[in-house]
Amino acid sequence: LPTLSHEAFGDIYLFEGELPNTLTTSNNNQLSLSKQHAKDGEQSLKWQYQPQATLTLNNIVNYQDDKNTATPLTFMMWIYNEKPQSSPLTLAFKQNNKIALSFNAELNFTGWRGIAVPFRDMQGSATGQLDQLVITAPNQAGTLFFDQIIMSVPLDNRWAVPDYQTPYVNNAVNTMVSKNWSALLMYDQMFQAHYPTLNFDTEFRDDQTEMASIYQRFEYYQGIRSDKKITPDMLDKHLALWEKLVLTQHADGSITGKALDHPNRQHFMKVEGVFSEGTQKALLDANMLRDVGKTLLQTAIYLRSDSLSATDRKKLEERYLLGTRYVLEQGFTRGSGYQIITHVGYQTRELFDAWFIGRHVLAKNNLLAPTQQAMMWYNATGRIFEKNNEIVDANVDILNTQLQWMIKSLLMLPDYQQRQQALAQLQSWLNKTILSSKGVAGGFKSDGSIFHHSQHYPAYAKDAFGGLAPSVYALSDSPFRLSTSAHERLKDVLLKMRIYTKETQIPVVLSGRHPTGLHKIGIAPFKWMALAGTPDGKQKLDTTLSAAYAKLDNKTHFEGINAESEPVGAWAMNYASMAIQRRASTQSPQQSWLAIARGFSRYLVGNESYENNNRYGRYLQYGQLEIIPADLTQSGFSHAGWDWNRYPGTTTIHLPYNELEAKLNQLPAAGIEEMLLSTESYSGANTLNNNSMFAMKLHGHSKYQQQSLRANKSYFLFDNRVIALGSGIENDDKQHTTETTLFQFAVPKLQSVIINGKKVNQLDTQLTLNNADTLIDPTGNLYKLTKGQTVKFSYQKQHSLDDRNSKPTEQLFATAVISHGKAPSNENYEYAIAIEAQNNKAPEYTVLQHNDQLHAVKDKITQEEGYAFFEATKLKSADATLLSSDAPVMVMAKIQNQQLTLSIVNPDLNLYQGREKDQFDDKGNQIEVSVYSRHWLTAESQSTNSTITVKGIWKLTTPQPGVIIKHHNNNTLITTTTIQATPTVINLVK
């Protein structure tokens, strides 16, 4: 490896060969290459300096940054300090022998520290060619070691962070979406404001009455057992892991070994065209933080065993202390931003658990303070002092990767009073956080949705509970337990997770950017939340959660509680723009099928696409109706061969994949991604008597010249019967066909579809149907169409592209779509589905109205009615209970024995009113914006009022807040107030 390498954006010093001739130093200051310390390779630059001495690097840097660049050019280096200094190192870039840009780096540390300073954060202003970097020593003589000096490199604007060495760097991170990773200094200062000093000069004990259970429960969760038998073979294998790390402790106490690193810090090194292959290889040669953590954790667990001999215990303890000191010396310590620290929580859990489990060993060896401080710093524990009015969301990344270790960092404080006060503050913060989720900000919504990336996101929800459930369990038998309302919210959200998933599998319509059919929710959180007891704290076991856990884990019972049957019922979750319906299978009553209808709106994004995820997912929420069979093995989804234009139930323009593929931009306040919003506010669900409905106004996006695509869509679900209506289907695309997909079903075993009574499973079958046809898919769901609609059916090998990498995929599929032709105008559709149809019987129903203003139906068996008012309108049907609505609402109604039950909701979350000017161009077309940049991201839902008119004179059975009844012309006017798109159920009598 060279000492100096010339790279695309600037030179880099690796110091592996001879002393380079580009370096000069002022008199009497010694420069040499040293093997004492190194961050890469085996050598670093050793500078023995006198006060105010200078070291000059004669390298040209071409500095030119766009004002709003997402990857500002950045200077990076690693410094090893043997002795803390009170005055800083000054670094100045010169242009024509004059200082153009400069900055300070504090030297108040020992060991390694990395600095990353964007040129735009330096003092001064300059562009163009910079000729020299002059480093000026502090006021006292000393020795510093430098390595991996990168003169200039593009770095994502979210990654450089302020820390103790360079507190002025990139203070924008304090308000970024990613602040939980990067605003470590801000959170550290919050903690310091309340605890200027922490007392480590006292004996560490963890057996005090009101806290002992927290330590015990965390250790029970982690499987710590003193009776664990450690065999000689286990010990040998474990010690071999330490040999692999090649760590050497020297007489002066310093430790050499490969650099300690983590994947997200290495990301910038892997960007194509930034570093040559040799340089990249040198930079990436490291001990990974997570691997070191895993080895330390196993050592800590072994050290808790009573079966160790004194000799073996000594061996393990030496390794444990060596590994801990190595991590700290590498710069992974309080106050250090480690150059880049984003997403490090995914790499640290084992390390921090190792320190928590080995806390008594650390205390005995004077390492409790630095390890506790590092845990507190990297988990941003200081956020427990966030002001109440600033807590507007719950970030699942925090709950998953930081919360547990925030708590454990406080449990490692030896001063009992400080620990007690800090835990009480954490309790208050956690209660508030769980109950705060404004607008489309992250966290736990009142309807059971769990938000991340400003949308209901089960893939992240499972991770949130992965970290949250053990924490709730650990705290629940102590004075620091959750409040009843916070615990209740978590229980509700967790129980909902097993409603909208099937045997832990996340439906495709809820898959976010992972439409692979492979993602599942975790089961363990149900166990730990069950063992945390009831929300009111009165019972040590939550039996509802126990029954759910037993079912999900395929056990007959758990803690003496029998497993539940799979859920049945209907649910409206309007923060997810979603209706859910489940019924027990006729073949297997313990199991239930799952139907989910879902849309999107001007508040809720319709897709999330990244460079290597969900490239073709634009239509995912265009009114999809996903039906998952009671027997999950019969599912019709296959990632291979799937036509991304044809999610079941969606109305779409069928495009070639090169046109359907997401064209990614980096928008202000966002990463490189696509998350498109609609212009419409009407999308959501309603329920009554365990039946449901869903409706939406669909509008395509002008980013892809699809602003002319519109449709009003609805589903009405009564038991196993679904009535699907569409109207106002239009667009001006004359090149491609518009279609509504009935089903797309993988048939790898040539499973049959029954069409008008005849079995079809012959490959390359292509049919055009247009006569009130009946189709039955391979799981027995019957689709019945009304006359006058053209259905295209195919049974063939289907070729597609992988959504992650565009590689070709294929599978056999049976597919049926209603064709609306090219550039349709005011088209509509009507079909019904009998899920698990009995005796090939189609649903019986009456359409009360089917036009652009209103979709309304009546189910024959239940006599229930459903109304999707897309706008204010009157009804013309003699069979309808309703006469009109003065606003866009959804209503479900049932008359029985002189009683009328209504469920009314306006699905508009109403987070803002009117149109946002910056979302439209001067022609009125929608502009792509990031939801993260919206001022209404954390807005409160505002109430909306609507009045419906019902035939006849009706009165409330009991007075109801927010419901006003008036009578006019022998009819009843009912005014309701909707907030957060939550349905209002009203009971009336004649």
UniProtKB/Swiss-Prot annotation:
Effect of Y460A: Loss of activity on both chondroitin 6-sulfate and dermatan sulfate
Transmembrane segments: none
Site (Important for catalytic activity) location in chain: E608
UniProt GO BP: carbohydrate metabolic process; glycosaminoglycan catabolic process
InterPro entries reported in the protein's UniProt record: Chondroitin_ABC_lyase, Chondroitin_lyas, Chondroitinase_ABC_I, Gal_mutarotase_sf_dom, Galactose-bd-like_sf, GH-type_carb-bd, Lyase_8-like_C, Lyase_8_C
Keywords: Carbohydrate metabolism, Lyase
Class of enzymatic activity (EC top level): lyase
Enzyme Commission number(s) from the entry: 4.2.2.21
Annotated phenotype, changing R513A: Loss of activity on both chondroitin 6-sulfate and dermatan sulfate
One function term, GO molecular function aspect: chondroitin-sulfate-ABC endolyase activity
Temperature behavior of the protein's activity: Optimum temperature is 40 degrees Celsius. Optimum temperature is 37 degrees Celsius.
Activity regulation, short description: Inhibited by Zn(2+), whereas Ni(2+), Fe(2+), and Cu(2+) have little or no effect on activity.
Effect of H343A: Loss of activity on both chondroitin 6-sulfate and dermatan sulfate
Comment on pH dependence: Optimum pH is 8.
A Pfam entry, by short name: Lyase_8
Residues carrying the site annotation Transition state stabilizer: R513
Residues annotated as the enzyme's active site: H453, Y460
GO cellular component assignments: extracellular region
Reactions the enzyme catalyzes: Exolytic removal of Delta(4)-unsaturated disaccharide residues from the non-reducing ends of both polymeric chondroitin/dermatan sulfates and their oligosaccharide fragments
Record PANTHER family: CHONDROITIN SULFATE ABC EXOLYASE, PTHR37322
Record family assignment: Belongs to the polysaccharide lyase 8 family.
Function, as annotated: Broad-specificity glycosaminoglycan lyase, which acts in an exolytic fashion, and preferentially degrades the tetra- and hexasaccharide derivatives of chondroitin sulfate and dermatan sulfate produced by the chondroitin sulfate ABC endolyase, to yield the respective disaccharides. To a lesser extent, is also able to split off disaccharide residues directly from polymeric chondroitin 4- and 6-sulfate, dermatan sulfate, chondroitin, and hyaluronan. Is not active against keratan sulfate, heparan sulfate, and heparin.
Designated name of the protein: Chondroitin sulfate ABC exolyase
Source species taxonomy: Bacteria, Pseudomonadati, Pseudomonadota, Gammaproteobacteria, Enterobacterales
Encoding gene per record: ChABCII
